[in-house]
UniProtKB/Swiss-Prot annotation:
Pathway: Carbohydrate metabolism; tricarboxylic acid cycle; succinate from succinyl-CoA (ligase route): step 1/1. It comes from Campylobacter jejuni (strain RM1221). This is Succinate--CoA ligase [ADP-forming] subunit beta. PANTHER family: SUCCINATE--COA LIGASE [GDP-FORMING] SUBUNIT BETA, MITOCHONDRIAL (PTHR11815:SF10), SUCCINYL-COA SYNTHETASE BETA CHAIN (PTHR11815). Succinyl-CoA synthetase functions in the citric acid cycle (TCA), coupling the hydrolysis of succinyl-CoA to the synthesis of either ATP or GTP and thus represents the only step of substrate-level phosphorylation in the TCA. The beta subunit provides nucleotide specificity of the enzyme and binds the substrate succinate, while the binding sites for coenzyme A and phosphate are found in the alpha subunit. The lineage of its organism: Bacteria, Pseudomonadati, Campylobacterota, Epsilonproteobacteria, Campylobacterales. HAMAP family: Succ_CoA_beta. Binds 1 Mg(2+) ion per subunit. The keyword Transferase does not apply. Substrate binds at residues 264, 321-323. Keywords: ATP-binding, Ligase, Magnesium, Metal-binding, Nucleotide-binding, Tricarboxylic acid cycle. InterPro entries: ATP-grasp_succ-CoA_synth-type, ATP_grasp_subdomain_1, Succ-CoA_synthase_bsu_CS, SUCC_ACL_C, Succ_CoA_ligase-like_bsu, Succinyl-CoA_synth-like. GO terms for biological process: succinyl-CoA metabolic process; tricarboxylic acid cycle. The gene is sucC.
Amino acid sequence: MNIHEYQAKAIFVDNGIPTLKGKVAFSVDEAVANAKELGGSVWAVKAQIHAGGRGLGGGVKIAKNLDEVKDYASKILGMNLVTHQTGPEGKLVQKLYIESGANIVKEYYLAILFNRMAEQITIIASSEGGMDIEKVAKESPEKIAKVGIDPQIGFKMFHGLEVARVLGLDKDEGKKLISMIAKLYKLYMDKDMNMLEINPLIKTAEGDFYALDAKCSFDDSALYRHPEIAELRDTTEENPAEREAAEFGLSYVKLDGDVACMVNGAGLAMATMDIINYSGAKPANFLDVGGGASPETVAKAFEIILRDKNVKVIFINIFGGIVRCDRIANGILEATKNVEVNIPIVVRLDGTNAAEAKTILDNSNLKNIKAATNLKNGAELVKSLVG
């Protein structure tokens, strides 16, 4: 689960992590009022959406007087902001964050995330802040520190010293940053985050460090332990189809291909997507119907994937274990009663009650179903139907 910058910064403040003063605004008048209340002569007017790259997309502006605050707020609020993370469809800006200015002398990058390959928590830091970290990693890898932390040991001084060394900080600056990272690490662990990112982390003329931006992503499976975090969910920022699928116990992620996938189990779903790509076609989604799929949930899955007008073929790949194949077959029939299916369906069913499922489909009146003998054959059929 992702949250907005203003929400992340409120959490930072509660945990003693330095941020600049700021207030959320839901209207132009409120934006101007917030700037007046914050005081000063420079403010940042920031679009609040669940995506990075806001500045390049025109969603972050620096105002040097209240008239500029009003002007920028009126332009950003209600705009459809397109960034490299939103996709071409963009995101509607429904709220702003008005933040006090600062005398910035240097920008850094800092993130804490879980490195699955290394089975460690990893701190990533760079002296090149305010930029695309992937570009920095490609062009100037020597400017990036990657410090692994064993969760059983936790964050220690030597971890912080390595970060300070790569960032080129002096002794006093290093002490300040290490203290800040220690608080961030504790917050990351305490709140079951997947990722905590500050880009940029700024150093002021006074030598102090502040989180100028804040991005936090939380483990959905751990939200039951953090009701105060779950309350921060902004469903307007989520894909409607993905949100609806979750309500029915389906794991759905929309992609940009033309082959819709319906699979049971995340591992098999990823393998299915891989073999579709290998065949030369492109998956339109990730869809795991889970272990408790019923005819009703399968019908709902059909309904959701058929809303994607790019879909040319549906590939159903089920290995019956907990999920019986006959349930999937009945779900297909149920779906076709309520939703008109005019595109080919490739079905590969194996495992529990696979023979019964084949009989159900053979006895149906569905003319556009093609049976696959195995996964490879299914991918080949899909590719031939996509063209």
